[in-house]
Amino acid sequence: MVNDIIADSLTRIRNAAMRRLDYTTLYYAKIVVSILEVFLAKGFIESYKVIDKDGKQSINVVLKYDEKGRSVISEIKRISKSGRRVYKGRDELKRFKNGYGTIVVSTSKGVIGNEEAYKANVGGEALCSIW
Protein backbone atom coordinates (compact mmCIF):
# COMPACT_ATOMS: atom_id res chain seq x y z
CA MET A 1 0.00 0.00 0.00
CA VAL A 2 1.21 3.48 -0.85
CA ASN A 3 1.43 5.98 2.01
CA ASP A 4 1.16 9.13 -0.12
CA ILE A 5 -0.96 8.45 -3.20
CA ILE A 6 -0.50 11.99 -4.56
CA ALA A 7 3.31 11.76 -4.42
CA ASP A 8 3.18 8.30 -6.01
CA SER A 9 0.95 9.57 -8.84
CA LEU A 10 3.18 12.59 -9.52
CA THR A 11 6.28 10.36 -9.57
CA ARG A 12 4.65 7.96 -12.03
CA ILE A 13 3.71 10.86 -14.33
CA ARG A 14 7.22 12.38 -14.05
CA ASN A 15 8.95 9.05 -14.79
CA ALA A 16 6.67 8.27 -17.74
CA ALA A 17 7.28 11.74 -19.21
CA MET A 18 11.07 11.34 -18.86
CA ARG A 19 10.88 7.97 -20.65
CA ARG A 20 8.57 9.49 -23.30
CA LEU A 21 5.86 6.90 -22.72
CA ASP A 22 2.45 7.43 -24.29
CA TYR A 23 0.56 6.75 -21.07
CA THR A 24 0.96 5.68 -17.47
CA THR A 25 -1.29 3.93 -14.95
CA LEU A 26 -2.06 5.40 -11.51
CA TYR A 27 -3.83 4.10 -8.42
CA TYR A 28 -7.40 5.38 -8.17
CA ALA A 29 -8.32 8.03 -5.61
CA LYS A 30 -10.81 10.89 -5.82
CA ILE A 31 -8.10 13.44 -4.98
CA VAL A 32 -5.92 12.15 -7.84
CA VAL A 33 -8.84 12.50 -10.27
CA SER A 34 -9.37 16.08 -9.06
CA ILE A 35 -5.69 16.90 -9.62
CA LEU A 36 -5.81 15.33 -13.10
CA GLU A 37 -8.83 17.54 -13.91
CA VAL A 38 -6.67 20.61 -13.19
CA PHE A 39 -3.79 19.19 -15.27
CA LEU A 40 -6.19 18.52 -18.14
CA ALA A 41 -7.73 22.00 -17.97
CA LYS A 42 -4.26 23.59 -18.01
CA GLY A 43 -3.09 21.44 -20.94
CA PHE A 44 -0.42 19.38 -19.17
CA ILE A 45 -1.96 16.00 -20.06
CA GLU A 46 -3.85 14.80 -23.13
CA SER A 47 -6.56 12.85 -21.29
CA TYR A 48 -7.26 10.35 -18.55
CA LYS A 49 -9.67 7.47 -18.10
CA VAL A 50 -10.80 5.59 -15.01
CA ILE A 51 -10.50 1.83 -15.60
CA ASP A 52 -12.42 -0.77 -13.56
CA LYS A 53 -10.73 -4.17 -13.76
CA ASP A 54 -11.89 -7.03 -11.53
CA GLY A 55 -13.41 -4.62 -9.02
CA LYS A 56 -10.19 -2.58 -8.69
CA GLN A 57 -10.09 0.87 -10.18
CA SER A 58 -7.06 2.52 -11.75
CA ILE A 59 -6.47 5.57 -13.91
CA ASN A 60 -4.80 5.60 -17.34
CA VAL A 61 -3.23 9.00 -18.05
CA VAL A 62 -2.31 9.88 -21.64
CA LEU A 63 0.69 12.22 -21.59
CA LYS A 64 1.07 15.23 -23.85
CA TYR A 65 4.11 16.08 -25.98
CA ASP A 66 4.94 19.01 -28.26
CA GLU A 67 5.62 18.73 -31.99
CA LYS A 68 9.31 17.95 -31.34
CA GLY A 69 8.41 15.05 -29.06
CA ARG A 70 9.32 16.82 -25.80
CA SER A 71 7.04 16.53 -22.81
CA VAL A 72 5.01 19.63 -21.98
CA ILE A 73 5.74 18.87 -18.31
CA SER A 74 9.12 20.36 -17.38
CA GLU A 75 8.83 19.65 -13.68
CA ILE A 76 6.23 18.34 -11.30
CA LYS A 77 6.63 18.54 -7.50
CA ARG A 78 4.71 17.66 -4.36
CA ILE A 79 4.45 20.73 -2.10
CA SER A 80 2.37 19.76 0.92
CA LYS A 81 3.41 16.44 2.43
CA SER A 82 1.96 14.29 5.17
CA GLY A 83 4.63 15.43 7.64
CA ARG A 84 4.56 19.09 6.67
CA ARG A 85 1.38 20.67 5.39
CA VAL A 86 1.82 23.85 3.36
CA TYR A 87 -1.01 26.37 3.17
CA LYS A 88 -1.11 29.37 0.85
CA GLY A 89 -3.22 32.47 1.25
CA ARG A 90 -5.01 34.14 -1.62
CA ASP A 91 -2.24 36.67 -2.24
CA GLU A 92 0.41 33.95 -2.50
CA LEU A 93 -1.48 32.30 -5.38
CA LYS A 94 -1.58 35.12 -7.93
CA ARG A 95 1.02 33.93 -10.46
CA PHE A 96 3.39 30.99 -10.63
CA LYS A 97 6.28 30.76 -13.10
CA ASN A 98 4.96 33.85 -14.95
CA GLY A 99 1.73 32.05 -15.79
CA TYR A 100 3.43 29.01 -17.37
CA GLY A 101 3.01 26.86 -14.28
CA THR A 102 0.21 25.95 -11.94
CA ILE A 103 -0.07 25.26 -8.24
CA VAL A 104 -2.86 22.79 -7.50
CA VAL A 105 -4.68 23.95 -4.36
CA SER A 106 -7.23 22.14 -2.20
CA THR A 107 -9.73 24.81 -1.15
CA SER A 108 -13.22 25.01 0.26
CA LYS A 109 -14.38 25.28 -3.38
CA GLY A 110 -12.66 22.00 -4.31
CA VAL A 111 -9.33 21.18 -5.91
CA ILE A 112 -8.50 24.02 -8.32
CA GLY A 113 -5.53 25.79 -9.89
CA ASN A 114 -3.85 28.79 -8.30
CA GLU A 115 -5.33 31.35 -10.71
CA GLU A 116 -8.87 30.09 -10.12
CA ALA A 117 -8.27 30.21 -6.35
CA TYR A 118 -7.03 33.79 -6.64
CA LYS A 119 -10.09 34.81 -8.65
CA ALA A 120 -12.41 33.02 -6.20
CA ASN A 121 -10.67 34.86 -3.33
CA VAL A 122 -9.75 31.67 -1.44
CA GLY A 123 -6.56 30.06 -0.21
CA GLY A 124 -5.88 26.50 0.80
CA GLU A 125 -3.46 23.61 0.98
CA ALA A 126 -0.92 23.66 -1.87
CA LEU A 127 -0.87 20.05 -3.08
CA CYS A 128 1.60 20.19 -5.97
CA SER A 129 3.13 22.39 -8.65
CA ILE A 130 3.60 21.69 -12.34
CA TRP A 131 5.26 23.59 -15.15
UniProtKB/Swiss-Prot annotation:
One of its GO terms (molecular function) is structural constituent of ribosome. Keywords: Ribonucleoprotein, Ribosomal protein, RNA-binding, rRNA-binding. GO terms for cellular component: ribonucleoprotein complex; ribosome. SUPFAM superfamilies: Ribosomal protein S8 (SSF56047). One of its GO terms (biological process) is translation. Pfam families: Ribosomal_S8 (PF00410). InterPro entries: Ribosomal_uS8 (IPR000630), Ribosomal_uS8_CS (IPR047863), Ribosomal_uS8_sf (IPR035987). Belongs to the universal ribosomal protein uS8 family. NCBIfam families: PRK00136.1 (NF001109). HAMAP family: Ribosomal_uS8_B. PANTHER family: 40S RIBOSOMAL PROTEIN S15A (PTHR11758). Part of the 30S ribosomal subunit. Contacts proteins S5 and S12. This is Small ribosomal subunit protein uS8. It comes from Wolinella succinogenes (strain ATCC 29543 / DSM 1740 / CCUG 13145 / JCM 31913 / LMG 7466 / NCTC 11488 / FDC 602W) (Vibrio succinogenes). The gene is rpsH.
